[in-house]
Design a protein with these regions (language model features):
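Conserved Radical SAM active-site core
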Residues: 1-138, 146-150, 160-161, 165, ...
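Auxiliary Fe-S-binding modules of radical SAM enzymes
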Residues: 2-14, 192-297
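Hydrophobic faces of well-ordered beta-strands that scaffold small-molecule active sites
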Residues: 29, 82, 115, 139-141, ...
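Active-site beta-loop-alpha junctions enriched in small/polar residues
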Residues: 87-89, 120-122, 142-146, 182-184, ...
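Anion (oxyanion) recognition and catalysis
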Residues: 109, 171-172, 199, 259
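Glycine-enriched alpha-helix->loop->beta-strand junction motifs that scaffold or abut catalytic
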Residues: 133-139, 199-204
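Short acidic/glycine-rich loop or secondary-structure boundary segments that cap or lie
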Residues: 149-150, 187-190, 214-216
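Conserved strand-turn element in the central/C-terminal portion of the radical SAM core barrel
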Residues: 156, 168-189, 240-244
Length: 297
């Protein structure tokens, strides 16, 4: 089936297996209930997927809805990391209609897998009932600004306030949460201000630098030139001259922030478990793609 719904080209496609062995540093398996993502983030690395899927449409304007054989033996994934949403957002707006992510979670109940859900949506609160049944599950929201205008320039996902509210609701339901400050835009992202907003409702606070490569490098550089002209020299130093001093200074700032708030500070690690409220583990993912082979998610 193929149709256009609210300007998005929707196709329903068959896939032999929804579970894919992952090359991600945190993954045993990557699971993407959809192909494409209608958040249309300007900096999204996943737009490279078009090379493999054959889509000619602009990234963010299409979505393939996958149909897969039911997972008959979820115990097969016991102890494995399962990342939901590595190159899509399982809670894109179309999830309300198609329900693929909810169906996936239902099939993973009893798996004893270590599940990580990556999203920019507040729709995840719909599935709190299932998240509670899954045991080891973590929900991560990407939040790299408190400025809704900048957010709207970058993506069409849920508002920052809605993401923060969803994080609070999921956290209070007893589910481990992550605030993923990704990507950190030089001169724009104030990660300490974000930390102060979310520290009482997240267990982990990840920091990742903005990577610029491929087609979206020009998009972002042109945006900075048009909207933040004073930052052009900084972006030129970082992304054309490969000067790392800015992010090296941010690492120092993040470590000082950890001491200030009595939080653990770890380098390219993903600790497990819950932490005392108000003291999330701060995870330094700056330049981690060189160590572990990934980019902004």
């Amino acid at each position: 089936m193929e149709e256009v719904i609210n300007g998005i080209l929707i196709r329903e496609v068959e896939t032999k297996n929804i579970m894919t062995k992952s090359s991600l540093p945190v993954g045993g398996y990557s699971v993407n209930p959809y192909v494409g993502c209608t958040h249309a983030c300007k900096y999204c690395y996943a737009s490279f997927m078009k090379r493999f899927t054959g889509h000619k449409e602009e990234w963010g304007t299409f979505l393939d809805v996958k149909h897969w054989p039911e997972i008959k033996n979820p115990k097969k994934y016991a102890g494995q990391r399962v990342v939901i949403g590595s190159v899509t957002d399982g809670y894109n707006p179309q999830e309300e209609q198609f329900g693929n992510t909810r169906k996936l979670l239902e099939q993973l109940i009893g798996s004893d897998a270590d599940i990580l859900i990556c999203t920019k949506s507040d729709l995840v609160v719909r599935d709190i009932d299932l998240l509670k049944k899954l045991g080891r599950v973590t929900v991560s929201w990407s939040i790299n600004t408190l400025d809704e205008n900048f957010k709207n320039d970058m993506d069409s996902a849920s508002s920052i306030e809605h993401r923060i509210a969803a994080m609070k609701q999921v956290y209070e339901a007893g589910i481990r949460t992550v605030c993923f400050v990704s990507p950190v835009f030089p001169g724009i992202t104030d990660f300490e201000a974000i930390f102060e907003r979310v520290k009482d409702q997240c267990d982990l606070f990840w920091l990742e630098n903005l990577n610029l490569r491929g087609g979206f490098k020009k998009t972002i550089m042109d945006y900075i030139a048009g909207q933040y002209p004073d930052l052009v020299p900084l972006y030129d130093e970082i992304y054309n001259k490969h000067n790392r001093s800015y992010f090296e200074a941010l690492e120092v700032k993040a470590e000082k922030m950890a001491k200030k708030y009595d939080c653990a500070f770890v380098d390219n690690e993903m600790p497990y478990g819950r932490v005392p409220q108000g003291h999330p583990v701060i995870v330094d993912y700056f330049y981690h793609e060189e160590i572990r082979g990934t980019e902004n998610t």
